[in-house]
A protein has these predicted regions:
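Short, low-complexity, polybasic intrinsically disordered segments
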Residues: 105-109, 139
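Pyridoxal 5′-phosphate
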Residues: 125-129
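C-terminal edge-of-domain segments
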Residues: 136-152
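RNase III-family endoribonuclease catalytic core
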Residues: 1-106, 115-116
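Short acidic capping loops at alpha-helix termini that bridge into adjacent secondary structure
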Residues: 119-122
Length: 152
């Protein structure tokens, strides 16, 4: 299972699922802070018993500063391939009060499927709110959860 969370701040672009979403706030992070891709990569790496994205793409590295998370996703797929695995499917949930994610889900699926080299039907993405509860409900951040099925 993968999980990630990033704080919403002014002055940053909002990248989720590999696409830029128009919004007055963006996610703060060392890379582009794509919370969905980060959760998916953690799920994929975890399924292969290969630790997490922080281990492979540390936020202390100059190489990952401002990195496009689609590169992290591409490289994660290459990493699991070194152990003979390939991705079967992903099931992910984005938790955000605003902006509404549902209109963007098909573009996210298409974008990530192209990076991974799979059919968009293998990338399940759902969106929910926290009914105005917690940091997500107060629009202080966005989180994402993911599980991945891999096979040899």
């Amino acid at each position: 299972m993968g999980y990630d969370v990033h704080q919403l701040v002014a002055g940053r672009d909002l990248w989720i699922g590999g696409i830029k979403i128009e919004h007055e706030l963006g996610l703060l992070g060392h890379s582009d802070a794509d919370v969905l891709i980060h959760a998916i990569c953690d799920a994929i790496l975890g399924a292969a018993n290969m630790r997490d994205i922080g281990y492979h793409f540390p936020d202390t590295s100059a190489e990952t500063d401002g990195m496009d998370s689609k590169i992290i996703l591409r490289d994660t797929i290459a990493l699991i391939a070194t152990k003979g695995y390939h991705l079967v499917n992903v099931d992910a949930t984005i938790c955000a009060e605003r902006p509404k994610m549902n209109p963007h889900i098909p573009a996210m699926q298409q974008c990530m499927a192209e990076v991974i080299g799979t059919d968009p039907d293998n990338i399940s993405i759902k969106a929910t709110t926290t009914e105005k509860l917690g940091f997500t409900g107060r629009q202080e951040g966005i989180s994402a959860y993911a599980v991945a099925l891999i096979e040899k």
